[in-house]
Amino acid sequence: MTLSMFGYASTDAFIKFIGLILPLSEILFIRGIIAVFLLFLLCYLRNEVFVSINKNQYKFISLRIFGDVGCTVLFLTALINMKLANATAILQCLPLALTFCAVIFLKEKVGWRRWSAIIIGFFGVLIIIKPNSDGFNYYSLFAIGAVFFIVLRDLTTKKLDPGIPSTFISLITAISVTFTGIIFSPFQNWVIPSVEIFLSLAATAVFLIFGILFNVMCMRIGEVGFVVPFRYSIIIFAILYGVIFYNEIPDLSMVAGTVIIISTGLYTFYREKFTKSKNLQ
């Protein structure tokens, strides 16, 4: 999972730079074409281009694609218009959102301790986005929206048949994101990218594939309670990229909010693990 987060953080760092020059739809399309080509080549070499899929898997695959497309569009929009570390930190309330959605949609029972962690964790998000101050950036709402699309993506990933190759899932996801760029293209003015920008987009495609493959493998075969905490490693990568390339020094509110989000997220997972083990006794 740490390798997956490195891939995603590296992609984000490049996208933030490219987003100052190219519109998002063009970024999605060009990066997508490169990613689709590389993934198709990988699937071909592994004889996984044509896969037999049970009909009852179609809905889960479709929901996963919808979740991935939604989180990609919303998060990249936020990323281009926010500090890299801030946008990334907001995404780390994912474990809290997973628990919240499990209660609302899956009717899972959650005690007062985890409810308290959820409330405190979302308070940490508020500290980062500063809704009542002059420093409020409404693009942070896009990052929050992306979280719930990631919840949809990850929950449906766990429902996928283990027999479906991770590379194939990554390929059809990349194709869908690429078509999303085409759909939004009439609403944005595309420009001819320079060689430097094109190479940067190629790098984002490589890092994206890196992140997707490891993420799919971890979420499918890993124990969620063990794997998900390693998502927080992306904060470290995002801060380093922000400081080195964008001179974005984390402020006190960002640090405080991030600590709260990570602490409550870890507590929520370990409390859930404790509750399940207690019920099995």
Task: Name every feature range the model reports, one short phrase each.
Residues 75-77, 94-116, 236-255:
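C-terminal transmembrane-helix exit sites in multi-pass transporters
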